[in-house]
A protein has these predicted regions:
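Beta-rich, blade/repeat-based domains predominating
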Residues: 38-49, 82-93, 122-135, 165-179, ...
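Hydrophobic, well-structured mid-protein blocks that either form specific transmembrane helices
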Residues: 106-164
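Conserved beta-strand positions in repeat-built beta-propeller and related beta-rich domains
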Residues: 53-58, 96-103, 138-142, 183-187, ...
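Blade-loop segments of beta-propeller domains
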Residues: 71-109, 114-126
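Surface-exposed loop and turn segments in beta-propeller and other repeat-based domains
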Residues: 32-34, 75, 79-82, 158-167, ...
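A short helix->beta-strand "capping" segment at the edge of beta-propeller domains
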Residues: 23-39, 69-73
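Short loop/turn segments that connect beta-strands within beta-propeller blades
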Residues: 67-72, 110-114, 150-153, 195-199, ...
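Beta-strand-rich domains and repeat architectures in extracellular enzymes and scaffolds
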Residues: 31-63, 78-90, 239-241
Length: 257
């Protein structure tokens, strides 16, 4: 679990995000609601071939699960050794990548059998992960997003995320949608839509009130998890130990508030 110092930093960052934004802000409407296990401490999340793929965290509880959206039925599950705190996941061809918070190991699995096929190492912390057609994009809790070579996991380039002149840190779970990077901000109810070219925040999605406070397990049950169904243009969001996954539509943006 993140330290108390990190939590305080995240809360300060969330307050700054709420008060110092320059980009326009969108709201949402709920289209549908799907079941989600409150045992799942969501760190990675994507939709592919009609299924939800999820990477969960916490030492001794980290796993990869493949579930049926409508029922929440688990079709596959792979627990990882208890010394690892699982973080972001992404698909790449026939494989699935999962990296770890502070162990500096990225596991590569066969996506269909969840059998490990290789490992990569890296420096720094592992948080969120997504992909373009050619690169893997990662976050590490700072304001920097790194673009990596899928064949080596080495950094190719990076961008610093800013809203106006303000750096936006605590970048967490990621999703690449229609040429933009969507990023959860740890301990914030907002998602940033980020330009992959220069890192500027294009707009915000304010998801305040999506899950009532009395349905959250604890203070760490925060918004974290973005998935996109490209074929049907559907956007899904969830959070750590949330009882539901929400399909949402984004409303037109308004001026910053």
């Amino acid at each position: 679990m993140r330290s108390l110092t990190l939590r305080i930093t995240a809360l300060i960052a969330a307050l700054l995000t709420a008060t110092c934004i320059a980009a326009p802000v969108s709201s949402y409407t709920i289209v549908a609601k799907y079941p989600h296990s409150t045992d799942s401490y969501t760190e990675g999340f994507f939709y592919l071939d009609g299924l939800f793929y999820e990477g969960t965290g916490l030492n001794g509880h980290s796993a990869i699960t493949v579930t049926q959206p409508e029922t929440g039925k688990s079709l596959q599950r792979l627990g990882i050794p208890q010394q690892y705190f699982g973080e972001g996941i992404v698909d790449w061809g026939p494989n699935l990548y999962e990296w770890t918070w502070t162990s500096h190991i990225c596991f590569v699995y066969d996506r269909f059998s969840l059998r490990e096929v290789k490992r990569f190492t890296y420096t720094g912390e592992g948080w969120g992960m997504t992909r373009t057609e050619n690169e893997i994009i990662t976050s590490d809790g700072t304001s920097t997003l790194r673009f990596r070579d899928p064949n080596t996991f080495k950094e190719i380039r990076h961008i610093v995320v800013k809203d106006g002149a303000t750096k936006i840190d605590q970048l967490n779970e990621l999703e690449y949608i229609k040429g933009e990077i969507y990023a959860n901000i740890w301990h914030s109810d907002r998602i940033a839509r980020i330009s992959p070219l220069d890192g500027h925040v294009i707009s915000w999605i304010d998801l305040t009130g999506l899950l009532p406070e009395d349905q959250k397990v604890n203070a760490e049950s925060v918004l974290n998890g973005i998935a996109y169904d490209k074929q049907h243009d559907r956007l899904f969001v969830t959070g750590k130990q949330w009882p539901a996954i929400f399909e949402i539509k984004i409303t037109p943006p308004t001026k910053p508030r």
